[in-house]
Amino acid sequence: MNMTVDPRRKEKINRYKAPKNQGQSGGANEDMMPDYMNILGMIFSMCGLMMKLKWCAWFALYCSCISFASSRASDDAKQVLSSFMLSVSAVVMSYLQNPAAMTPPWAS
């Protein structure tokens, strides 16, 4: 005589409730590094384009690659892609204007 009785207690079951976000921000656990790298990439690519500094253009490409690699799936893909394309265009335009090799900033 084998009876199958459910051993769980119905009064002890608590349904999971997701924590509410505080205000506009996603909370303290949200990683802001992709956003910071995106902004840095845009700033350095503009410096590379306007001031014709090759090291700024390369650093912008580096920042936008980090931003692309660490972005979440829920992030706006257009913003990340536009930052990446802006940094690539900064590198290309800086070498089209002056095809000489890059000199380090401390050597000039």
Curated annotation (Swiss-Prot):
Transmembrane segments: 80-96
Main location: membrane
Keyword set, alphabetical order: Membrane, Transmembrane, Transmembrane helix
BP GO annotations: protein insertion into ER membrane
Record localization: Membrane
Any Pfam family the entry gives: ASTER
Membrane topology: Single-pass membrane protein
Similarity-based family: Belongs to the Asterix family.
Protein name, entry field: Protein Asterix
Native organism taxonomy: Eukaryota, Metazoa, Ecdysozoa, Arthropoda, Hexapoda
